[in-house]
Amino acid sequence: MSEKQAIFTMLGGRVRLYRGIYNPTSDAAWLAAFAADTPAKTVLDVGVGTGGAILCLLANNNIKNATGIDVSDKMLAECAKNAELNNRDIELINADIMNWRTPRTFDLVITNPPYFRGTPAAHNAHHNADIVKWMKKSVARVKPRGTFCTIVDARVASDVIAAIAGVCGDISIFPLFSTKHTAERVIIRARVGTNGPTTIYNGLAMNCDMILRDGLTISNTLATLDPQC
């Protein structure tokens, strides 16, 4: 396989990734685009996989210390190669978030959880994971007044919001619409230990080029909204 075939890009070429056991989808770009507006010195990506989300985030946010955790050593090996390809230093931890015992907390925690159903993929050790437990374990790693951000299937968004509402405030809900004009994904951002109001955005189309091609953050996209979005 040639180098051109072996590597694909995200965010208009700003992020380069090796084709491997799992190739990140647009969900990674969307998650990063909403999380990138958060000031943070430290970030944890729960279920980092091959690094798509955290690398997209680092392309738009000058975070000094990045950490990823994943139960799959094969995924982490791919992530390490992708981090090197993008000249990024990411601490990688081979552990299961469901039973990871650590006092460490982070300014920002992001996760693109294994919410999908169907035939388990070899790379997805947490196929059909308990989404509520996953979210609670992830939120537990956020510093007080820090930020949690996730992207989920719209069908489980209410479960996720209910799971984090007891410890989070300032919840922002951002729907992503398919061609059927119904939300297919929902990005959720919240702050731990606050009690601010919930904000629901109008959302954008899932194929919005300003995010996927141009690599803008969601706030920048909304400020210069393209009619096609």
Where are the predicted features?
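SAM-dependent Rossmann-like transferase core, predominantly class I methyltransferases
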Residues: 3-42, 48-60, 189, 205
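Conserved beta-strand segments of alpha/beta enzyme cores
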Residues: 14-16, 65, 89-91, 169-172
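Mobile active-site "lid"/loop adjacent to the S-adenosyl-L-methionine
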Residues: 113-140
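Short amphipathic alpha-helical segments
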Residues: 80, 121-123, 161-164
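Conserved Class I SAM-dependent methyltransferase catalytic core
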Residues: 130-183
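Conserved SAM/SAH cofactor-binding pocket of Class I
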Residues: 30-102, 108-111, 117-119
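SAM/dcSAM-binding transferase cores
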Residues: 182-229
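Residue-level signal for inorganic ion chemistry
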Residues: 31, 112, 134, 190
